[in-house]
Amino acid sequence: MLDTLRHVIEAHGGLENWNQHNALSVDLVIGGMLWGLKGQAGKLERTTVTVGLGKEWASHQPFGPDNRRTRFSPDRVAIEDAHGKVIEELAAPRASFAGHALETPWTEPQLAYFAGYAMWTYLNLPFLALHEGVEVEELPIWHENGEAWRPLRLTFSDTIATHSKVQTIYAGDDGLLRRHDYAVEIAGDSPAAHYLGKYVTVDGIKFPTERRVYVAGPDGKPMPDLMTVSIDLSNYRFV
């Protein structure tokens, strides 16, 4: 394991502690310009997500009206009513985004797919870097906000549903993640600069309670007037 990655893993609570758990739930308040662009404003404004830790799956509830919920896995996504009856489903969901740009509207199953893989990725980091389908490379020091951050480039195998094959996470001197860069492949490879902070500790594991995602310019700097997603997270609990 790279020394920087080891420092990051320990700063977030350690692998031994993390491996004691199988799933995680957290309450979300979600905003940003993305949802309106996709024709899905308000569907996930206030919701709870539960994700697998390691195995890739996720569920949001409520999802829109009537306390509906989603079921996400890389090869299938479904929307269910409050009693578990399937209302709509989509197999091989990623293929349905062919030709999409940032402004292309999404169907509800497409929204559920995006939200599912995104939150699974976010909540499993940085431990996801140790997944057998992820390769890690250390990059040169990155200076931002008067700090020197240590970047790690993550290259994902095709078996993992996530934003893009190559992503970068940045850790501060304390080992906690500050930033996460990726291109949203299913939205025309839109480049994103994702900032996270205001950490809390839950059963020995550190989690951010604030996430802000901006369109990234050609120089890698965020465009502050183009905040695509905001997420406030509370009431983390292992389940």
Give the location of each predicted region.
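Flexible, processing/modification-adjacent segments and terminal tails
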Residues: D3, D81-I160, A187
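Catalytic loop of the DD-peptidase/beta-lactamase superfamily, centered on the K-T-G motif
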Residues: P62, D66-T107, A216, K221-Y236
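Gly/Pro-enriched, hydrophobic low-complexity segments
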Residues: G146-V239
